[in-house]
Structure formats: structure tokens, C-alpha cells
């Protein structure tokens, strides 16, 4: 039985965001790097998982720790601090699941580089966007604030020629923040992703999201979309957020907000399937929440892991309330 009886509605949605992000990462790890044809030849249709995820969840939970340690005001330096103090999570047993340029950036921190310098030379990745869900929870109901904080945090690993990855992080964070608004729908949270991105500097990512969502809505079905997307929107680096973020948002649309459908569709999408699933599952979890119906779906996760994610959700919700109270108090003081 899921440990949800005592949770508030907000806490249930935050828990679902984290739990389904983990499921998306774990299920997608089976098909990561594969194209759809190879997935079908090897597995048929993927709809099961084992394990607790890869680098996506590790980096996400390090960011959550940074937010908790700073009462919700984490910046790029604070995330870097968690990379250093918990470096065994990056360089440990799952180090082979990290993209090389991120391991290189983390190694720079170990060698006393300033955090603001480690992004130099990094390749395009989804490291910040795949990890950004806690920012959406802490800024729940305020997509603009979520986008601003996500942009700052993403600058740890994405600057200059790959700064568009900041836009990807802003899009995912604002989408999750918008999912906690009363009356939120699939369409409203997807619109939040577009609205979060600067229309001038972020024009490339913004346009890609708009175009890919239009393709999803006009496609006959998921497989037709998948074929068209992989013909026109794939990048040389499969973890490039210009590919993964629009794809994840399209998975949200095809799943109509159902987190299980989102992670299954993501796993069968191929390419950077675990990262796409982590983002899509997190968004849909935040939108839909969690109930007893999810027990069987989440059963492959170890009980200890589920409890850890539950406590993490509770901590992030508490930080949200604390931060919101502090912001209200600050804005109420004026001469």
C-alpha cells in the first residue's frame, strides 16, 4: 500500500511528481540510445521497469537537497555545493550513466574551479532540465518565479553556445509549477512552458516547443508523431535539450496528463528515453497526483526508495510554504 493516507493534496501531487520522474528514468534506461525499430525488435512494447533510475534522479535529488538547505533560494553555487558534498553519488556506481561533459564539469569542482567557470566547454545536455522538478515544486503556482530560478541554476552547466539548455530548464520548471495551480490542465501547463522562455534570446527553444507540440496535435497517432519527429527534430547529441524537452512535452500531450502513460510512451520513444521519461513523468505526476490506483504501477520501486521520495516531497512542500510566506512578508514592507 502506498504511504499516502496522511498527505495533503499538494503533497500527493509533489510525491507523484518525484515518484513518476523516477519511474520514467528507470523505464527509459532500458531503451536509452535505441531507435524505435530496435526497441520493437528487442522488446516489442516496453511497459515495465526495474531499478531506481540513473543520473537524472541523482542530479534532481541533489538539487532538492540544495533547495532544502537554502529555504528554497538555491542558486547555481548551491547546486554545485551539493555536487561536492555528495560527490560519491556522481562518481559512484552510476558514474557510467552520466554524460562525459557533466563528469568533466564535476571533476573541475573537485579541483577547486569556481562554479561559475565549470560550464565552459560543456556540450548540449538536458542535465538541468531533467533535474529541475524540485524548483517547480518549491515555486508551485508561480511559473514565472520557477523559470527565473531554473535559469539561474542551469547556468552552472549551460552557458554561451549551449545557453539554450537554460531555456529547456525554465520550460520544465514552469510547467511543473503551473501543474499545481487550481484548474490546471494539460494545455495550460504546456502553454506555461512556452510562456516561460524569453522570446528573443530563447527563440530557438521556444520555436521548437511550439512546432513540436503542433506536430503532436496534428499527427494521426503517437507512432506517426514519433516517426515524423525523429525524421526532423533529432540532434547530433541525443541528450541535447533542443530535442529532449520538446519531446517530453509532446509525451505529456499524448498521455493527456496520465503519468504512467507518459513514462511508457517515453520509454518507447527511444533516443534519450530515460531523460524524456523523467521530465514527462514528473510533469504528469505533478498535474494528476497520486492515489491507491498507482500502487501497482509503483510497486517495482523498493519500499525504502518510495519512502525517501515521500519525505523529499514533504520537505519540498514545506519549503514552498516557508518561501511563499517569506516572499509575502517581504513584499508587504514598504515606505
Residue positions per predicted region:
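Structured, active/binding-site neighborhoods that engage oxygen-rich ligands
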Residues: 1-335
